[in-house]
């Protein structure tokens, strides 16, 4: 009989006392539930002084806002904990620390990050963390290289692909990224004023062919252990520090997906800034987002290439020039997935505050239109791009009219 039961606040406190690795466990006395609680219960465990000491996170067996008609596997809690532990093995400085997890209870205890801030909120507020983009690039390089065929043996990699198979959560990604935005689906959510743009996307054969290719690669290319949901809301930042959280969508997939999702969230902020700040601050912020895009990719590519030269195990993959060739393929994937993120976050089920929190209705719509046009352009140009500088230059010069020619 399963030991699973939904935690109360009291359960969370008691669990943290047992497994929170604090020196004074009996000082843990209260639990505050945080987050939207639709997929998980997340508790901040506080001590007698009211200080948050650890986090207890438990997966729910269904989407709470819908009910038991939308069940979800509890195994995602194991996958999340093991993904974070694996990523922490190779990049501990940028991965939240997992203190304990129990697969049967679908629960995890992790370090408290109250001294950090959600990166999306900071980007919206105009607060700049100069090392964040470089640190994100480092995280992506370390985690994706060390879980790829460049580093793992074929036997270990195949076993890991099986262990991290995550069909239910991958199905969510497959639908929300690659299917729903391009059909009339009840999950889609957009301002009716945007219907002409939405219909144009649905009727664009070249775009839909490109999206089909991106989806096929997502379904079939088990290149590395992805975070699977690496947006600016799953990244915490502080002065000189960055930590990733929420890896329940982890699975072995195309490396460019994680990179593209991360870049897409920087560009969502880029699109929203004219509605979030005054003209001068918006212009400066947008220029910084483009620099951040360059920094993330350049840091990732340089570190991945250096790691490949130092640590590649397979003699064929160690052939001079192959890693550079492989990174070209990753870059083109990343640009396509970046465009997919822009579109699905604008008209699909799950939106972002970078656009939706804009108070002025007309400005919000203009920013949303920009995100849609930029997303479409990136998807179409992706097979033809060679470097990040060329793409950034085109976005800067003519942000709504990228054309699919070699950059």
Curated annotation (Swiss-Prot):
By its UniProt entry, which InterPro entries does this protein fall under?
A: Aminoglycoside_PTrfase, Kinase-like_dom_sf, Methylthioribose_kinase
Q: Where does ATP bind?
A: 40, 57, 111-113, 246-248
Q: What class of enzyme is it?
A: transferase
Signal peptide (from-to):
none
* Domain of life of the organism encoding this protein: Bacteria
Name its pathway: Amino-acid biosynthesis; L-methionine biosynthesis via salvage pathway; S-methyl-5-thio-alpha-D-ribose 1-phosphate from S-methyl-5'-thioadenosine (hydrolase route): step 2/2
Q: Name one GO biological process term.
A: L-methionine salvage from methylthioadenosine
Q: Which residues bind substrate?
A: 229, 344
What keywords does the record list, in alphabetical order?
Answer: Amino-acid biosynthesis, ATP-binding, Kinase, Methionine biosynthesis, Nucleotide-binding, Transferase
Q: Per the record, what are the reactions this protein catalyses?
A: 5-(methylsulfanyl)-D-ribose + ATP = 5-(methylsulfanyl)-alpha-D-ribose 1-phosphate + ADP + H(+)
- Stated EC number for the protein is 2.7.1.100
Report the GO molecular function annotations. Answer: ATP binding; S-methyl-5-thioribose kinase activity
Describe the task this protein carries out: Catalyzes the phosphorylation of methylthioribose into methylthioribose-1-phosphate.
Classification via PANTHER family: METHYLTHIORIBOSE KINASE
What is the annotated quaternary arrangement, including any partners? Answer: Homodimer.
Concerning its family, UniProt says:
Belongs to the methylthioribose kinase family.
HAMAP family named among the record's database cross-references: Salvage_MtnK
Name listed for the protein in its UniProt record: Methylthioribose kinase
């Amino acid at each position: 009989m399963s030991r699973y039961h939904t935690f109360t606040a009291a359960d969370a406190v008691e669990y943290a006392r047992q497994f929170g690795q604090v020196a004074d466990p009996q000082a843990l006395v209260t639990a505050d539930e945080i987050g939207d609680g639709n997929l998980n219960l997340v508790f901040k465990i506080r001590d007698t002084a009211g200080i948050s000491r650890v986090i207890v996170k438990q997966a729910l067996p269904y989407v709470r806002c819908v009910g038991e008609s939308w069940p979800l596997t509890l195994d995602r809690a194991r996958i999340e904990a093991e993904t974070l532990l694996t990523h922490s093995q190779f990049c501990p400085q940028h991965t939240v620390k997992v203190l304990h997890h129990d697969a049967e209870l679908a629960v995890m205890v992790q370090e408290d990050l109250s001294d950090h801030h959600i990166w999306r909120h900071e980007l919206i507020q105009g607060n700049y963390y100069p090392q964040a983009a470089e640190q994100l690039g480092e995280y992506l390089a370390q985690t994706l290289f060390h879980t790829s065929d460049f580093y793992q043996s074929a036997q270990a990699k195949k076993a890991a692909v099986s262990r991290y198979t995550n069909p239910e959560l991958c199905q969510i990604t497959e639908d929300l990224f690659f299917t729903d935005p391009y059909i009339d689906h009840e999950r889609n959510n957009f301002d009716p004023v945007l219907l002409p743009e939405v219909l144009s996307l649905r009727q664009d054969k070249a775009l839909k062919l490109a999206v089909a290719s991106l989806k096929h690669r997502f379904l079939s290319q088990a290149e590395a252990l992805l975070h699977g949901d690496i947006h600016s809301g799953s990244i915490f930042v502080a002065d000189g520090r960055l930590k990733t959280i929420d890896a329940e969508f982890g699975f072995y997939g195309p490396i460019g997906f994680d990179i593209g999702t991360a870049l897409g969230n920087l560009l969502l902020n880029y699109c929203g800034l004219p509605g979030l700040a005054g003209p001068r601050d918006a212009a400066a912020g947008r220029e910084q987002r483009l620099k951040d895009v360059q920094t993330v990719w350049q840091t990732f590519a340089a570190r991945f290439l250096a790691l490949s030269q130092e640590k590649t195990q397979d003699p064929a993959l160690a052939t001079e020039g192959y890693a550079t060739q492989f990174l070209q393929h990753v870059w083109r994937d990343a640009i396509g997935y970046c465009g997919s993120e822009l579109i699905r976050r604008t008209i699909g089920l799950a939106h972002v505050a970078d656009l939706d929190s804009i108070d002025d209705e007309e400005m919000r719509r203009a920013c949303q239109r920009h995100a849609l046009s930029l997303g479409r352009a990136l998807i179409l140009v992706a097979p033809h791009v060679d470097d990040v500088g060329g793409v950034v230059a085109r976005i800067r010069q003519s942000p709504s009219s990228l054309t699919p020619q070699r950059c």
